[in-house]
Each structure stands twice: as structure tokens, then as C-alpha cells.
């Protein structure tokens, strides 16, 4: 209590002194003077004895107060003074501190005197104190409004600006103390439009715009005037062709050749347009697949090819041959069709319309071709390129996906090969094909074409296989074709065999081919299609043997694949084999172009798979297979599919007819998976194309043997070493051994828990 009183008294004294003093410095001095006088005022009243007693009290009081308390008091006092705003100068504060320390002794005496002596004095002092405190408070409120008072309860919370308008009631959004206060100043709030929203009336009616353009983002490129349909000229200016044309650019753009390797539905869809697009497809003959369309489109125009096709169909090859010559000497109208068919996508477009006619002409061609084999003239007419194209287009039609792949990849190869081969065939047949001879030379020059040849043969074989069934029905309808073809196939086949032997493919193969020819002859329909197919297969076999032996095989294979019943192919093959290192190419092609596994799987799926396999160098064997499926008696020893399995690697040669080259087929076509897939008459034979896969697919090999009733080994494919890739695949799955570790870790964790 005493301490509080003292503090109050000091505060009042200070304020009084401040009032008295005129300036800050003066007030500091007057402080000390007035305080000293005040402190001394009571002293005269005190008696000496009381003074002594007061002093002793003082000391006892001051020990607590002066020792520690003095500093504290002086702090409090200075704080009070500061709080009250009575002192604004540091000098004053220092003086006050000194004063308080001096006054401490006298003040306790003054207090103790009233307590001990006279309550009246105390009352008088108390009154003085109260008055002074009131004055100080009034002064503070008047002079110090708006200044922060630190924690003494006198702080003013209101801003000085708002103090004047204290009485006015503020809106919630303007009252800063209200949570609903909306700031109106500052960068962040310049976009705060709350409360300013004014609904603008939008035009009503049918044609009203749903948005306004004033506020439209600049990057919004929508222009109403651009929404109308564009004219054809505009479209062509924009995209380079009329994008509304369902067939795509029909100007023979090379990009058209970009067909999925599996020419399945894509090629079939285009078949509808094949007649129109064929010209583009015919470009196949030309450069690589990319350029096929443009070149061939020039060479073969839909009108021309169709007319020749229609003519040749009924008449068989004879009528077709001249048109072929007209096309390129080596290309028959059917060739253009096939070429078109081959065309990556266009062939498929053309395929639909041409399919019926094409298959018939093809059959007719085949029949004539078979005859033509006897008379190389037919083959010559259909230069290898023509033959290949025919087969490809047919295959594409029937086996949309695979042919496309073959066509796409081998298209340029075929072209080259065709160019090469035509001359040989033509020469052999005695027919002089200007284009053909040139092509033949080109083929001889370029070994890679042999790959193409193989692929050609593959596509042809496949097409033949595929088409054969369809062709059989069609051929049945063709009296000429069926009878002539049947008769011709034997002769053609025998000639083919002879040609093959001439080519130096394999005498054994020749025998096998002959057998196959006989088998194919057994059924008229089969005779027509199978004979050509078988011949193609036989050629393929020879080709595969050649592949083992050298390029000649390829030439033969190509011929076989291309013209199952075409003499041209044979002759061209014979000629090619020597100059062309087909085996390597075949292996490479098969290896790099079609993974034996990958490629053959799809091929089988097409049911033309046998044909597809030949391009891989297994084509030859597939040809053998075809005969077997066609004529199980042909190779009775091979009929035992399971037996070929064991022999697939080493014994396969034995299982295969003597004509077949077993050693070459070191790698049995392991990929004869879908016997059912081979939906030829020869569904049995799995194509050796999978030969490369033997290591991985020994069982498939067995299947192929079982299916063909003959052990089929693709020597080239076997030689090709893409087979190693399958093991990698198997290794990946095998590598999945993390699960057991997980179990162990779980067990360990369980043990730990337990």
C-alpha cells in the first residue's frame, strides 16, 4: 500500500511540477527543486525523536526499498512518467531517477510520520494525492489522446482519424473492427468488385450471342466467320489435299504406302477403292515401299489394269499376257492390280472391288501361269514383278494384314526383283519384255532384292494359300481356268521342277516339287490353286535350298512365291540365284524384317501363313508343307507331324521329302504353331518360317511337322540368328523371382512379431 501511495504521489507531484515548468528543461530543474521542497515540508513538523525513529524505519524500509526496491521504484517511476507522457526528454528521466533516489529517504520519513503521529496529516496528504492524480488523468486525456499507453489500461484503440466520428454508426463493411470489413485501398483490392455488380441485360432471342467479345481473351482464336464449311480449294490450300475425301489424298502421295506391317483390315478397307486407287498402288513396282504408290500409279492406271484384268480373267493368262507387256512388258494388268493391291494402303482399298475379279484372274493367271510354266511365255508376260504383285494383292485381299507387311517391306525389293526377274522369265519363255529384261538386270545387280524375292514368294505363297481356297471356288467357276490350269499345273510343275534343278536349287527338291505337283493335280480346284501354290511352294523350297546354297534359291523362291503357277518366276529365279546371294538376304530379311516368331505368328494367323513363311526362307518348306496338306500321300514319311518334331533340328531333312534340304534347315521352323491357322487346303503344314525360332519353339516345329505331315525346316531362317531373341523374352518372365523373397520377408516379419 505504501509503495502504491508513494508512486501515486510521485506521479501527481511530477504532473504538478510539469504544469509549473514552462519548458522541458525547466520542468526538469523545477522537478528537483519542487521535490526537494516537498520532501522537506513535513520535516519541520517532525520532532527529533520521531525523526530518528522514522529514520530507523526508513532504513528498515529502505533496505527492502533502497537496496533492490530503489532501482525498481525508479524504473516504475520512469515508466510511469513515460507512460503518462509527462517527460519527453531523456535528461528529465535521468534527473528524475536521481531525484527519486535522493527522495527515497525523506519520503518514507514523511509517510511514517503521519502513520505514527497524526492521522490528520495523512488524510491531508491523501487528499492532495487524490487531487493531483485526478488532475494528471485529466491532463493526460486532454493532451495525449491517440498516443499509445503501454498496458496501463489507458491505450486508445481507435484511430485518431476515426475519433471524431465516434458517435457515427459505421456500416459493417466499413468498420475495421467488423469481420465483414471490406478493404477498399491497396493494390490487391483494386479488383475487388463486391457490391459493384451490375447485371447487364443480355439480348434475348434466337440469334443472341452467349458471350460478349469485348472481354474475350486475346488468345481465343475462335472466329465465327471461320466456322463455315471450307471450299475444296481452301482445303487443298490448307492440307494439300481434300481431307473430306474418305480415301485420303488420291494423288499418289507416297505416304500412302505407310501401311501397318500387318496388312489386315487396313488393306481390306482400301480394297473398296482398289479399282480407283490401284494406279497408285501399282507404284509398288517403283522405288521402296514409300515410293511405291507414286511410281506405280504412273505405270498402272486403274483403268488400264482393270480392263486387262477383266479380259485376262475369262481368257486366262493368254489375254492377260499382252496387257502385261503393255504395262511394262513384265507387268500384266493383273500385275497392276496386284501391284495396287500390294500398295501399302491402296492395295487394300482396291482390294475389295478387285478381290472377286482379282482372285479369278489370279486363278486364271495361275492356271495359265502353270501352263505358262510349261510355256515360259506366260511367265515372261507376267514378269516376276507382275507375278509378285499379283500374289501380293491377292494375299493382301485375303490376308489383309500380312500382305501389307510383306508388301510394304518388300515392295521396293519386289520392284527391283521384279525388274530383274522379268527379263529372265521373259527370256526363258522366249518372250521379250522390255521392262522385264531391264528389271531382270536390275535384280541381278541388287542382291537385296533377293530378300524381296523371298518376301515376294512368301506373300505369293501365302496369297496362293489364302487365295487358293477362294480361287478354287472361283476357278471352279472358270471352266477354262480349271481344266487348263489342272492340265498345265502338271506340266508347269514338272517344268518348274526342271527349272529349279536347272537353277541348281536341288535335285531332291525337284522330285519333291514333282510329287507336290502330282498331289496338287489330284484335285482340280486344288490342282488349279495348289498346283500354282505348290509350284510356288516348290519354288520356295528350291529357293530355300538355294538360300542355303546361294542366291539362286532366292530367285526361285521369289518366282515360286510370286507365281505359284508362273513360268516366269521360275526362269527369273534360276537366273537370279547365281547373281543374288538370296540366302543371306532371306535370313536377314526374315531376321530383321520378320522376327521368325513375330512374323510367323501373324502369318499363321492369316491362314496364308504358309505363304508368309516362305519369305522368311521357310517359304520353300512351307511350299512342301502345302503339298503335304494338300496331298498327305505326297510325303507319307512327313505325314507324321510328331516325328518331324524330333528331327526338326537334325532329322528334319529325313522327314522332309528328299527334295527338301534338311541340313539347311538347321533351325527348324519352330513357329508352325497354328496348324489351324494355315487354313489352306494345307492347314496341316505349319510353315517353316518359324524355323528361326526352333530353339525357342521346338514344339511349334513339331507342330509344323505334324501339320504338314512333313518336317519343314527353314534353312535360311535357321541360319538367321534372330532366334536368340525369343530366349530373352523367356528370360524376362523367368526373372520374376521377387515374390518368394517377399514371402520370406513376410515370414521373418511374422516371426519377429511373434
From Swiss-Prot:
Entry keyword set: Cell projection, Cytoplasm, mRNA processing, mRNA splicing, mRNA transport, Nonsense-mediated mRNA decay, Nucleus, Phosphoprotein, RNA-binding, Spliceosome, Translation regulation, Transport
UniProt organism field: Danio rerio (Zebrafish)
Annotated compartments: Cytoplasm; Cytoplasm, Perinuclear region; Nucleus; Nucleus speckle
Acidic residues biased stretches: 58-68, 119-130, 391-401
Stated role: Required for pre-mRNA splicing as component of the spliceosome. Core component of the splicing-dependent multiprotein exon junction complex (EJC) deposited at splice junctions on mRNAs. The EJC is a dynamic structure consisting of core proteins and several peripheral nuclear and cytoplasmic associated factors that join the complex only transiently either during EJC assembly or during subsequent mRNA metabolism.
UniProt record similarity statement: Belongs to the CASC3 family.
Biased composition (Polar residues): 294-304, 317-331, 470-480, 495-509
Low complexity bias: start-end ranges: 22-34, 481-494
Protein name, entry field: Protein CASC3
